[in-house]
């Protein structure tokens, strides 16, 4: 099923330009979105808690910084650009008690709304505006007069403003209309995003890379060669896949590599498909969200243990040496 797609010519930038936007958070996304809004002639202010290390940075870049509850009381559109696991705590204390009918609260990911961590009052709009890329890329592409694909979704309508028109206009201010703004739902964005991260982009890729590296090491191959073949060259293939697609990738590799890929895909594909279906099921039934929020409540014991252990692995130790020339050039 094809999603509706909107471009600059379809979207009225004046909608968001007529409203006061408040951005909660000034991390990578918050900074990039605030700067893009300003360059798109949109009024934007930043909301941060007292003592935040980001206050001086936001002020240095010319933004007015308010406490979160004050920002909420003086904004038409409030963008919650915080880590997913902080939404419930921050919004319940600093945002929801101060909302008025007609305001709109926006999110860059559907997690907290879809999994009922955040429930907004009736008459307050809930929109999703999700750039398909990190904050650094969002800003860089905007400055090059290009943009990233954006997803928008409407979970709840505003009693005053047209939530869809606001979401589209906001995405245009981000540069999204230059590339394409696709309309979806909070559910679809959230579940597909989590699945992509876990099964392919982060979890899946890391598992394949590490297992490949360890397989070669165990078989007696030098660590340097194992790293080159299983880690270093991933970027070359990923770039081809990004710009050329699967067929284009096939056309740019040798017959040996293509035939080997087909042979390897057959046994690996069957196993991966079953595992991926289980991963998706746990996302859909809320098991993953429950586990993640429990992890947060315990102050991230699993994450902290994994991060510490990763530093001691052979793949990281040899990788640090081999990456040094590239990092030095930067």
Swiss-Prot record:
It catalyses: (2R)-2,3-dihydroxy-3-methylbutanoate + NADP(+) = (2S)-2-acetolactate + NADPH + H(+); (2R,3R)-2,3-dihydroxy-3-methylpentanoate + NADP(+) = (S)-2-ethyl-2-hydroxy-3-oxobutanoate + NADPH + H(+). Pfam families: KARI_C, KARI_N. Residues 185-329 form the KARI C-terminal knotted domain. Keywords: Amino-acid biosynthesis, Branched-chain amino acid biosynthesis, Magnesium, Metal-binding, NADP, Oxidoreductase. It comes from Helicobacter pylori (strain ATCC 700392 / 26695). It is an enzyme of class 1 (oxidoreductase). One of its GO terms (cellular component) is cytosol. Belongs to the ketol-acid reductoisomerase family. This is Ketol-acid reductoisomerase (NADP(+)). The gene is ilvC. It comes from the Bacteria. Mg(2+) 1 binds at residues 193, 197. GO terms for molecular function: ketol-acid reductoisomerase activity; magnesium ion binding; NADP binding. Pathway: Amino-acid biosynthesis; L-isoleucine biosynthesis; L-isoleucine from 2-oxobutanoate: step 2/4; Amino-acid biosynthesis; L-valine biosynthesis; L-valine from pyruvate: step 2/4. Mg(2+) 2 binds at residues 193, 229, 233. Its cofactor is Mg(2+).
């Amino acid at each position: 099923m094809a999603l509706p797609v909107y471009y600059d010519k379809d979207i009225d930038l004046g909608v968001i330009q007529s409203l006061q936007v408040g951005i909660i958070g000034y991390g990578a996304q918050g900074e990039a979105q605030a700067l893009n809004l300003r360059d798109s002639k949109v009024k934007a202010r930043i909301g941060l808690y007292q003592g935040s290390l980001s206050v001086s940075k936001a002020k240095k870049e010319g933004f007015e910084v308010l406490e979160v509850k004050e920002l909420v009381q003086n904004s038409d559109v409030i963008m919650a650009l915080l880590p997913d696991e902080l939404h419930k705590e921050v919004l319940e204390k600093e945002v929801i008690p101060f909302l008025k009918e007609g305001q709109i609260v926006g999110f860059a990911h559907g997690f907290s709304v879809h999994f009922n961590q955040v429930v907004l009052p009736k008459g307050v709009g809930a929109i999703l505006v999700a750039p398909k890329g990190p904050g650094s890329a969002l800003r860089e592409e905007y400055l090059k007069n290009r943009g990233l694909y954006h997803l928008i979704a409407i979970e709840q309508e505003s009693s005053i403003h047209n939530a869809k028109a606001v979401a589209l206009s906001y995405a245009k201010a981000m540069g999204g209309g230059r590339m394409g703004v696709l309309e979806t739902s909070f559910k679809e964005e959230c579940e597909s995003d989590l699945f992509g991260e876990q099964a392919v982009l982060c979890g899946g890729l890391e598992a394949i890379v590490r297992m490949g590296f360890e397989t070669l090491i165990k078989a007696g191959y030098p660590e340097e060669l194992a790293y080159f073949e299983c880690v270093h060259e991933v970027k070359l293939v990923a770039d081809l896949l990004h710009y050329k697609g699967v067929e284009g990738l096939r056309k740019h590799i040798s017959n040996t590599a293509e035939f080997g890929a087909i042979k390897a895909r057959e046994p690996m594909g069957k196993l991966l498909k079953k595992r991926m279906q289980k991963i998706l099921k746990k996302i859909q039934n809320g098991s993953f969200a429950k586990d993640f929020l429990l992890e947060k409540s315990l102050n991230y014991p699993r994450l902290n243990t994994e991060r510490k252990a990763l530093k001691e692995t052979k793949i990281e130790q040899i990788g640090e040496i081999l990456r040094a020339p590239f990092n030095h050039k930067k």
